[in-house]
């Protein structure tokens, strides 16, 4: 009986760990490239495309920045369609050799750049 309880405890801990890990990497409020492309065409509004990976430390810092900085997300949503592309899981809309990469524009006409600093990113977007 003790073995069953121990097994249940291990399974429960594993489920909690998986749940916490998946939540910490989520990009809530961001669209897939296909969804963003469609909205961009319908609304005649440029996309802001964040290309990253779940393993990239700098990408994780940007994800946390976007989750915690409401004014930055308000600016992005007001001026762009926010799109996130995981370069390890999806085909990227532009060729990338490193991450993170940020792009603005419409499908087929994206202007891309890179930075490791959220404040610098916002300065570039606000120009």
Curated annotation (Swiss-Prot):
Mind telling me which InterPro entries this protein's record contains? Thioredoxin-like_sf (IPR036249)
Q: Name one Pfam family in it.
A: Thioredoxin_7
Keyword field contains Signal: yes
Cleaved signal peptide residues:
1-26
> Gene3D superfamilies attached here?
Glutaredoxin
Q: What does the UniProt keyword field contain?
A: Signal
This chain's protein is named Uncharacterized protein AF_1675
What species was this sequence derived from?
A: Archaeoglobus fulgidus (strain ATCC 49558 / DSM 4304 / JCM 9628 / NBRC 100126 / VC-16)
